[in-house]
């Protein structure tokens, strides 16, 4: 994944330093694109170890339409904990652990009616179910889009969706996906996002009877936090290793039937993990 290392170097060399919401400070560029041929290996970063289990559990959580971190906690995944504290959720009148209309809600219940207690009726638009049906019945459509960004609700959550919109494209029996990410934490977040959407593309391709094409990552405000510069420079000293392979249970024909046990990576080699603080 040399293209990812090239992005780190590009930001360090050419980015502009600016303040940010968290008070940490960033070095940022605006508008960047990376392309990964999914037939040539699974794009899980090798220049530092990435916790694939957390990526899988989070994606399954999104697909459930869930917005409470209890499912993540039950599976020992802590990547959303900073935004699920009592202090954070109380800002929006929600109990600890309830994140509100984040990814799962937008994907599976977009535009739902809010109840007086802050919960939502199940009367919104299920974008994922619609997408699967559309890929199967109208694969040449240019409207194979899922949006995680609802302007009416973006201000009702501690962390509005960073990966905001994704589109699929079918050609020659292969499924490709492009993600637009409005805000891209390149050191911590982007490696997860690349792997998550690559995994989603494989899963949807399987249930739609398609092969896989490309995953295209497009970033808006593409940044390194100021307290990640040293870690990025360390990562740039490491040589990429061969990509691993993804194995899915071939018996699964419904996207919502996938469980953790149905998803496996094979021959993952990586350099050691590099720790870095999360900006909240």
Swiss-Prot record:
Pathway: Pyrimidine metabolism; dTTP biosynthesis. It catalyses: dUMP + (6R)-5,10-methylene-5,6,7,8-tetrahydrofolate = 7,8-dihydrofolate + dTMP. GO terms for molecular function: thymidylate synthase activity. The keyword Transferase applies. Pfam families: Thymidylat_synt. GO terms for biological process: dTMP biosynthetic process; dTTP biosynthetic process; methylation. It comes from the Bacteria. The active site is at 162 (nucleophile). Its EC number is 2.1.1.45. It is an enzyme of class 2 (transferase). (6R)-5,10-methylene-5,6,7,8-tetrahydrofolate binds at residues 51, 185, 279. It is found in: Cytoplasm. Keywords: Cytoplasm, Methyltransferase, Nucleotide biosynthesis, Transferase. GO terms for cellular component: cytosol. DUMP binds at residues 21, 142-143, 182-185, 193, 223-225. InterPro entries: Thymidate_synth/dCMP_Mease, Thymidate_synth/dCMP_Mease_dom, Thymidate_synth/dCMP_Mease_sf, Thymidylate_synthase, Thymidylate_synthase_AS. The keyword Repressor does not apply. Catalyzes the reductive methylation of 2'-deoxyuridine-5'-monophosphate (dUMP) to 2'-deoxythymidine-5'-monophosphate (dTMP) while utilizing 5,10-methylenetetrahydrofolate (mTHF) as the methyl donor and reductant in the reaction, yielding dihydrofolate (DHF) as a by-product. This enzymatic reaction provides an intracellular de novo source of dTMP, an essential precursor for DNA biosynthesis. Belongs to the thymidylate synthase family. Bacterial-type ThyA subfamily. Homodimer. This is Thymidylate synthase.
């Amino acid at each position: 994944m040399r293209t990812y290392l090239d992005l780190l170097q590009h930001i360090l060399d050419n980015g502009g330093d600016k303040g940010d919401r968290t008070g940490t400070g960033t070095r940022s560029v605006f508008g960047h694109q990376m392309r990964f041929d999914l037939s040539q290996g699974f794009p899980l970063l090798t220049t530092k170890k990435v916790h694939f289990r957390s990526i899988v559990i989070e994606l399954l959580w999104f697909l459930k339409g869930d917005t409470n971190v209890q499912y993540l906690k039950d599976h020992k995944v802590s990547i959303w904990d900073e935004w699920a504290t009592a202090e954070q959720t109380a800002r929006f009148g929600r109990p600890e652990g309830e994140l509100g209309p984040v990814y799962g809600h937008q994907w599976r219940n977009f535009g739902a009616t809010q109840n007086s207690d802050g919960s939502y009726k199940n009367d919104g638009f299920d974008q994922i179910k619609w997408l699967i049906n559309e890929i199967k019945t109208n694969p040449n459509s240019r409207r194979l889009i899922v949006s995680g960004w609802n302007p009416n609700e973006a201000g009702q959550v501690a962390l509005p969706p960073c990966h905001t919109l994704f589109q699929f494209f079918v050609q020659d029996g292969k499924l490709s996906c492009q993600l637009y990410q409005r805000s891209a934490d390149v050191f911590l977040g982007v490696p997860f996002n690349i792997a998550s959407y690559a995994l989603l593309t494989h899963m949807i391709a399987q249930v739609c009877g398609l092969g896989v094409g490309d995953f295209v990552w497009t970033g808006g405000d593409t940044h390194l936090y100021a307290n990640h510069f040293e870690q990025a420079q360390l990562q740039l000293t490491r040589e990429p290793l061969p990509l691993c392979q993804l194995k899915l249970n071939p018996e699964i024909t419904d996207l919502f039937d996938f469980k953790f046990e149905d998803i496996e990576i094979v021959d993952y080699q990586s350099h050691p993990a590099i720790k870095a603080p999360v900006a909240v």
